[in-house]
């Protein structure tokens, strides 16, 4: 009850309805004797006829009826009024002795009143409807629950009486229902909740006891007697924040035994099944209800009491006799379902949103068996489209990403958010700010994304709250686009230039684009605004089909996570010194030079700040070892710097790599692993090892710098993309590379014989070591000469197996080879193949190999030292190799594992063909739907067949599949046919078909049919072909030109200048009768194609080229249409011109005769389009489109 009271909000327009299950037990007057009570009860129940359909309103009040009525609970009328005085602490509730009721004046402020529904019109003039001016309660009023509701003795005097209109329609069925009864007229608005269905009889007003059953239990034994108790009633009232609860406990002393039980076994008569619950033991302590801080609330149960202090209510445990059920039966299934439903209302509700008001009281009443929530929480006055609740205020263990969405009302931001949250499209234009939440998986970790949709301009609180801001505008609404620029300026002024780390995204929505509302914001303008915003990404979405909706939020969340990690890394790197500190305090470790030089002591120490920071950022145990600097590094006594500045490529490549330091400064990727390694290039002439500071980044790049100082300042660094590389370890095969020869590595006893020789480093050069004997099956010799051919791969496999099977983890002698560069591998193959072929014995071949090494290196000790390395190779797909050497086996293996993991992550991040196909299909679905939405495109342009699936590009019309074959026979100079479902649809083709449509095409090509009947969907092919050829080939139905005498060239210029697509199409159709004179009196000698490109009109440019405009035409200054298209910033027009072979604007002013048909190389190269439209747009092509 305390939670329900605390949930009341002090608002004048909000009505809170809390359904409370209150069991009030009437205390009947003490009967003269138990025998009299027992004798009177059956008489009251014995011969009542049950007529559910009989009305009760027509019976006389004094007439007795032999009928039992089932009532669960009477109507509870909850009335709320204006807010009371805030901050007043209500007095405590305490039981008061029963006293004659007197009227209580209404207290100012909000109040909550509960009383029984009277039989007639509600009374007025007091707080309770039964209060009269005299102070005596009305005789026509009955208690909320009569004692027979839970098996108590029937009160005398009201056996057959009833309250009209309060009975259940089917009292005999024992159903439990909730119904809403009309409230009585009152000066304050209120709502009524009525529960009915329990058996109830008449009864006079008496005290009552609050009963809160905790859980269901077994019924009590028959014949349990009522426990006498003391009746009490409590009331409290006060101005402003008063609360009063009136209770009456127990039955009178000397109450008799219960009367005859109902013949209905196991049926509950209360909503909470309290009559089926076992009561607590007789020795149970009384139940104490603490004071409930209810603001301005008064509760009246049976009678009203004088005003006074209200200490906590003490509720005694109910009598066992009153708690047992009928005949000891259990509740029915319907009762349990109803109780579970009503209990779910209470348990699933939470506190209301934060707002002014007193804090909620105790969570519920507590009994010996535990606490139970008794009241429901606040019903939300304005439910949101998506639930938004306490995640805005509660602390959570998972990290939060705060996304703000800004835009105009008509920008489509509400539909965009709704699509992302629910996966469905809904037209929403919210004028109020909203808040949402959703869990997302970013970088393998769950994040709670808090989305805040701002209806107006951002404020200082919003700018400080958001981690990322998404600006949304509609591509068909110019005002929404201008609003985005204004909102960005306001956000920048609030946030300031010095504060970074805010991820931005610009989203253009295509939801409202249609034939009636075309696109007005071009792609170039949107991207220009995106560039001005700095560090902003541009997307075009369609909430109708879900195009790029999830991608926007996923990539923005990824940017937020990346920015956070970069800021943490920057904070950690600020504590680094400007140069690496070399101190003699570190432990020196001896290192042997690879060329057999002397041993030198080298000690290097690095500050621990970046190491700790990276461990905290990545939390990877495998990378901890890699973050520490190796204790010793191989270093030659004298080392010369390479004469070649760049060993991997040209100077331009070096400059491009070094220039990436701008992007890898404060915003570079997070290093996964970093340490000093020795490095040499496998393709350069300089084979010396050089010390490099190597870092493996989370974006799939491996960077190395000459020193850590260069890494901090992002200078003199080089990087390699691991996407197209692999990592290898000399002497080891890849883990999944299994030889096809199987377990034949021990042929001729190679493993058994050669693994017994172990070369040491001390005075003893060799020590016999026992080796596990191979299985007998592996020692079988081949019977033919094929063993000689298998000897070489088997020996290599034996080296790999012996390396992997070495118990100590060191390399065995079989795997100690020179570094496997391509040239060395060829020499080794030649040297190994010669003795194997001549001798035929692997033992002798290996002995000769060792002798060759002995001559080369001078001693077996130097052989061992020269081959003892911890290097690994990175090989690219282009053949480049990079050799790196670590300080130990553990560090090398850690580097190899980290690089392999990053290569796998880079490959997984690549857009697969399925994902690309899905993305393209979504884009094409949007384009095709836009084409179908054009006027007249629902039927075939020639025969009227519904849902055409083919299109004629240069006619701008949709045709059915039967007519498409005839159009294909006309040739591409008349009709370019393309399928809506089978072909690609680039943007320029989509714009042409949406701009023209079947309606405009028929007004041009089918203006005057001259009385000829148009074919239908059932017409034959001959009829269709005759009509189509007369329409498009013979131009019999072509609309006439105007009465003007101007030449076609001037009319076409005027139509292009007016951007009238229909007029341009009509003039181009008439121009097929003869040559089109495009000469106009333009001082710059521009053609209509120049003008269309200057206007950046994609549709007219494409139509002019399809109908034979000169793509190589130049103006007086020698500039082609491509110059004007680029000057206007239209990339689509430039691409169309380049597809048709338009020369660059830097050519000579003289035009060659073949310039119209021969594509020339442009002076300023432009990226080629990836769509298949390039193959269909050339003027001189003779291939039909299918």
Swiss-Prot record:
Q: Which residues carry this modification: Phosphoserine?
A: 113, 128, 149, 632, 744, 746, 802, 921, 979, 1172
Domain description from the entry? G domain binds GTP and has GTPase activity. Arf-GAP domain interacts with G domain and may regulate its GTPase activity.
- Where are the compositionally biased (Pro residues) regions? 92-106, 308-320
Annotated family: Belongs to the centaurin gamma-like family.
User: Where is this protein chiefly located?
Assistant: cytoplasm
Residues covered by the GLD domain: 396-572
Kindly provide the name given to this protein in its UniProt entry: Arf-GAP with GTPase, ANK repeat and PH domain-containing protein 2
Q: Which residues bind GTP?
A: 407-414, 451-455, 509-512
Q: Which Gene3D superfamilies did the record assign?
A: Ankyrin repeat-containing domain, Arf GTPase activating protein, P-loop containing nucleotide triphosphate hydrolases, Pleckstrin-homology domain (PH domain)/Phosphotyrosine-binding domain (PTB)
Q: Where is the composition biased (Basic and acidic residues)?
A: 47-62, 324-338, 648-661
Q: Which GO terms describe its biological process?
A: actin cytoskeleton organization; apoptotic process; cell surface receptor signaling pathway via JAK-STAT; cellular response to glycine; endosomal transport; epithelial cell apoptotic process; mammary gland alveolus development; mammary gland epithelial cell proliferation
Task: Please give the activity regulation comment for this entry.
Answer: GAP activity is stimulated by phosphatidylinositol 4,5-bisphosphate (PIP2) and, to a lesser extent, by phosphatidylinositol 3,4,5-trisphosphate (PIP3). Phosphatidic acid potentiates PIP2 stimulation.
Provide the residue intervals of the ANK repeats.
1084-1113, 1117-1146
Domain PH stretches: 670-904
Upper lineage ranks? Eukaryota, Metazoa, Chordata, Craniata, Vertebrata
Report biased composition (Low complexity) as residue ranges.
Answer: 35-44, 107-117, 124-153, 165-175, 189-198, 224-236, 362-376, 576-590, 600-609, 1148-1166
Which residues does the annotated region (Interaction with PLCG1) include?
A: 262-384
* Keywords on record: ANK repeat, Cytoplasm, GTP-binding, GTPase activation, Metal-binding, Nucleotide-binding, Nucleus, Phosphoprotein, Repeat, Zinc, Zinc-finger
Residues of the Arf-GAP domain: 925-1045
Return the annotated region ranges for Interaction with EPB41L1: 1-23
- Please describe the quaternary structure of this protein: Interacts with EPB41L1, PLCG1, NF2, HOMER1 and HOMER2.
GO molecular function term, any single one:
ionotropic glutamate receptor binding
């Amino acid at each position: 009850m305390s939670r329900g009271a605390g949930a009341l909000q002090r608002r004048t327009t909000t009505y809170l309805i809390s359904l409370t299950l209150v069991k009030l037990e009437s205390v009947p007057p003490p009967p003269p004797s138990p025998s009299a009570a027992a004798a009177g009860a059956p008489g009251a129940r014995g011969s009542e006829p049950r007529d559910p359909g009989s009305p009760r309103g027509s019976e006389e009040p004094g007439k007795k009826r032999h009928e039992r009525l089932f009532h669960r609970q009477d109507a509870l009328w909850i009335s709320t009024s204006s807010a009371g005085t805030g901050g007043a602490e209500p007095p405590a509730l305490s039981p008061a002795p029963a006293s004659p009721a007197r009227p209580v004046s209404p207290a100012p402020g909000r109040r909550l009143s509960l009383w029984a529904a009277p039989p007639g019109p509600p009374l007025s003039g007091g707080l309770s409807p039964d209060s009269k001016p005299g102070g005596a309660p009305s005789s026509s009023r009955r208690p909320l629950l009569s004692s027979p509701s839970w098996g108590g003795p029937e009160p005398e005097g009201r056996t057959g009486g009833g309250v009209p209109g309060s009975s259940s329609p089917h009292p005999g069925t024992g159903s439990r229902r909730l119904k809403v009864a009309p409230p009585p007229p009152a000066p304050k608005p209120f709502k009524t909740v009525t529960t009915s269905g329990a058996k109830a009889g008449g009864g006079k007003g008496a005290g009552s006891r609050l009963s809160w059953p905790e859980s269901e239990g077994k019924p009590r034994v028959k014949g349990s007697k009522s426990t006498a108790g003391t009746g009490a009633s409590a009331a409290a009232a006060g101005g402003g924040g008063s609360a009063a609860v009136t209770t009456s406990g127990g039955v009178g002393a000397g109450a008799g035994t219960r009367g005859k039980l109902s013949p209905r076994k196991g049926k509950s008569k209360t909503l909470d099944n309290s009559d089926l619950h076992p009561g607590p033991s007789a020795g149970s302590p009384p139940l104490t209800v603490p004071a409930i801080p209810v603001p301005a609330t008064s509760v009246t149960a049976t009678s009203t009491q004088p005003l006074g202090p209200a200490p906590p209510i003490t509720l005694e445990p109910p009598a066992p006799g009153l708690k047992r059920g009928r005949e000891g039966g259990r509740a029915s299934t319907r009762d349990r379902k109803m109780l579970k439903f009503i209990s779910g209302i209470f348990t699933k509700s939470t506190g209301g949103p934060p707002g002014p008001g007193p804090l909620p009281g105790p969570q519920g009443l507590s009994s010996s068996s535990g606490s139970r929530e008794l009241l429901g929480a606040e019903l939300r006055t304005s439910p949101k489209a998506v639930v938004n609740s306490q995640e805005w205020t509660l602390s959570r263990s998972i990290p939060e990403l705060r996304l703000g969405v800004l835009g105009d009302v008509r920008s489509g931001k509400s539909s965009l958010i709704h699509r992302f949250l629910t996966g469905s499209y809904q037209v929403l234009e919210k004028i109020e700010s909203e808040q949402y939440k959703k869990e997302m998986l970013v970088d393998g970790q769950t994040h709670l994304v808090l989305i805040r949709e701002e209806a107006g301009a951002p404020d200082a609180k919003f700018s400080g709250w958001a981690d990322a801001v998404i600006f949304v505008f509609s591509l068909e609404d110019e005002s929404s686009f201008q609003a985005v620029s204004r909102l960005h300026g306001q956000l920048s002024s609030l946030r300031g230039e010095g504060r970074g780390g805010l991820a931005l995204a610009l989203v253009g929505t295509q939801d409202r684009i249609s034939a009636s509302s075309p696109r007005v914001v071009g792609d170039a303008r949107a991207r220009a605004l995106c560039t001005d915003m700095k560090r902003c990404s541009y997307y075009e979405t369609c909430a109708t089909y879900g195009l790029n909706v999830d991608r926007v939020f996923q990539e923005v969340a990824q940017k937020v996570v990346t920015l956070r990690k970069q800021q943490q890394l920057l904070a950690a790197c600020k504590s680094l010194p400007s140069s690496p500190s070399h101190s003699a305090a570190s432990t020196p470790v001896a290192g042997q030079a690879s060329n057999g030089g002397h041993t030198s002591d080298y000690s290097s120490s690095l500050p621990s700040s970046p190491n700790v920071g990276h461990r905290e950022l990545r939390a990877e145990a495998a990378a901890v070892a890699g973050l520490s600097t190796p204790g010793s590094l191989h270093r030659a006594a004298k080392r010369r710097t390479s004469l070649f500045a760049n060993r991997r490529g040209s100077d331009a490549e070096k400059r491009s790599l070094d220039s990436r330091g701008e992007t890898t400064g404060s915003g570079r990727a997070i290093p996964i692993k970093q340490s000093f390694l020795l490095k040499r290039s496998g393709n350069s002439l300089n084979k010396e090892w050089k010390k490099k500071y190597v870092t493996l980044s989370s974006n799939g790049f491996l960077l190395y710098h000459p020193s850590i100082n260069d890494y901090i300042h992002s200078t003199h660094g080089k990087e390699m993309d691991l996407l197209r590389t692999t990592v290898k370890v000399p002497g080891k095969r890849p883990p999944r590379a299994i030889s096809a020869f199987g377990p034949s590595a021990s042929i001729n006893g190679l493993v058994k014989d050669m693994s017994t020789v172990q070369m040491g480093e001390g005075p003893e050069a060799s020590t016999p070591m026992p080796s596990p004997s191979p299985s007998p099956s592996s020692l079988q010799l081949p019977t033919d000469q094929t063993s000689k051919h298998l000897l070489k791969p088997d020996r290599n496999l034996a080296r790999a197996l012996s390396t992997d099977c070495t118990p100590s983890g060191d390399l065995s002698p079989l795997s100690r080879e020179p570094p496997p560069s391509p040239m060395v591998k060829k020499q080794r193959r030649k040297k190994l193949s010669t003795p194997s072929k001549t001798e035929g014995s692997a033992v002798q071949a290996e002995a000769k190999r060792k002798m060759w090494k002995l001559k080369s290196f001078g001693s077996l000790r130097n052989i061992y030292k020269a081959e003892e390395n911890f290097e690994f190779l990175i090989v690219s797909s282009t053949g480049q190799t990079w050799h790196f050497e670590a300080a130990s086996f553990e560090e090398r293996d850690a580097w190899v594992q980290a690089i392999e993991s990053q290569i796998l992550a880079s490959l997984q991040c690549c857009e697969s063909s399925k994902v690309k196909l899905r993305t393209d299909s979504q884009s094409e679905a949007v384009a095709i739907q836009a084409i179908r939405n054009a006027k007249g495109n629902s039927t075939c342009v020639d025969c009227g067949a519904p849902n055409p699936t083919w299109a004629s590009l240069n006619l701008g019309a949709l045709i059915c599949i039967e007519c498409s074959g005839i159009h294909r026979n006309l040739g591409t100079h008349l009709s370019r046919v393309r399928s809506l479902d089978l072909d690609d649809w680039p943007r320029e083709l989509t714009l042409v078909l949406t701009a023209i449509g079947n309606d405009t095409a028929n007004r041009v090509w089918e203006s005057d049919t001259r009385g000829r009947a148009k074919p239908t969907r059932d017409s034959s092919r001959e009829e269709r072909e005759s009509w189509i050829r007369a329409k498009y080939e013979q131009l019999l139905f072509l609309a006439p030109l105007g009465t003007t005498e101007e030449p076609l060239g001037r009319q076409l210029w005027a139509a292009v200048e007016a951007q009238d697509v229909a007029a341009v199409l009509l003039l181009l159709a008439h121009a097929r009768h003869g040559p089109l004179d495009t000469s106009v009196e333009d001082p710059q000698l521009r053609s209509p194609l120049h003008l269309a490109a200057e206007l950046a009109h994609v549709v007219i440019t494409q139509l002019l080229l399809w109908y034979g405009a000169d793509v190589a035409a130049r103006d007086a200054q020698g500039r082609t249409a491509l110059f004007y298209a680029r000057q206007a910033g239209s990339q689509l027009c430039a691409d169309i011109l380049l597809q048709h072979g338009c020369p660059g604007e830097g050519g000579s002013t003289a035009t060659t005769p073949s310039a119209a048909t021969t594509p020339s190389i442009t002076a300023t190269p432009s990226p080629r389009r990836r769509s298949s439209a390039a193959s269909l747009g050339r003027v001189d092509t003779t291939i039909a489109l299918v």
